[in-house]
């Protein structure tokens, strides 16, 4: 294990990624690849992909600029929101606690029903997670966002809006760091909460590989998507790769392309 501040400083010295303050992680080597950047060019958009190949202690990135740019996390914040809900007791059981539909018909049909935590994260039900955030409250939310060292830790802009339109920002490297700590079960919260969140993350099978990931789509709740995220990790045999991808969503096809381009990048680096 090496200090994350030192590791990211080395990456910056190598003109790959910017320095920032982190705790401990095993990153030791890094590279960026034009073939990954070309995946976004081929979609007529701009974006970034960062992969951490755990067994190789290798970070692979598509670029040295956007990979360090902090943006609103959108629904990728459902990962820490779920952890905090479980830690605070707002949710006791992700399969039994029911969040009743508020009766407001929204453009995404899957949101217009009752949900458990598991079903809500599966369809990325923003209203459910807004209610969860309100029940957690500003003080407890700030405490845990600080404890988890999540992004810039700024939850200004409204307790049910800060990850959608407010002040919270996180960059792809920070996403990889956070997700990797969840994957390893070393976040400063209970093992139970981490196990449950790992279990409820949406799963995609690609051949003999498994991808556990959460998407994000900035503006989805108002019908005006602009930025897409996908963060998580891929498992193939004993090999694991943690990743974060974001891209500008300039047309409807880019929404579905979030998973497609991520799979392409994971294939390019030999992760799946």
Give names to the regions the model predicted.
Residues 70-94, 120, 243:
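Active-site SXXK
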Residues 109, 113-117, 129-184:
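Mid-domain, small-residue-enriched loop/turn segments at the edges of structured enzyme/sensor domains
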Residues 87-103, 189-193:
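Short, well-structured active-site flanking segments
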Residues 28-65, 231-234, 245:
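A short, well-structured edge-of-sheet supersecondary motif
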Residues 116-124:
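Short helix- or helix-capping micro-motifs
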Residues 6, 25-37, 70, 134-137, ...:
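Structured C-terminal helix/loop/strand segments within mature extracytoplasmic catalytic/sensor domains
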Residues 1-14:
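N-terminal secretory signal peptides and thylakoid transit peptides that target proteins
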């Amino acid at each position: 294990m090496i200090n994350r501040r030192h590791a990211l400083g080395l990456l910056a010295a190598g003109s790959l990624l910017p320095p920032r303050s982190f705790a401990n992680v095993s990153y030791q080597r890094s590279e960026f690849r034009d073939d990954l950047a070309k995946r976004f060019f081929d979609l007529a958009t701009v974006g970034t992909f960062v992969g951490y190949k755990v067994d190789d202690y290798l970070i692979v990135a598509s670029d040295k600029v956007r990979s360090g740019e902090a943006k609103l996390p959108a629904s990728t914040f459902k990962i820490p929101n779920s952890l905090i809900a479980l830690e605070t007791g707002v949710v006791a059981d992700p399969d039994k606690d029911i969040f009743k539909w508020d009766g407001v018909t929204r453009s995404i049909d899957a949101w217009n029903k009752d949900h458990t935590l598991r079903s809500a994260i599966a369809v990325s039900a923003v209203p459910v997670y807004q209610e969860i955030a309100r029940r957690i409250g500003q003080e407890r939310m700030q405490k845990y966002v600080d404890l988890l060292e999540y992004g810039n830790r700024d939850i200004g802009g409204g307790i049910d809006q800060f990850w959608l339109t407010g002040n919270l920002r996180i960059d792809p490297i920070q996403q990889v760091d956070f997700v990797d700590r969840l994957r390893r079960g070393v976040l400063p919260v209970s093992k139970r909460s981490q196990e449950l969140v790992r279990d409820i993350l949406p799963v995609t099978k690609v051949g003999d590989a498994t991808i556990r990931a959460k998407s994000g789509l900035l503006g989805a709740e108002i019908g005006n998507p602009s930025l897409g995220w996908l963060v998580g990790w891929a498992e193939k045999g004993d090999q694991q790769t943690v990743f974060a991808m974001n891209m500008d969503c300039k047309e409807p096809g880019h929404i579905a392309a979030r998973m497609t381009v991520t799979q392409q990048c994971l294939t390019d680096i030999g992760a799946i």
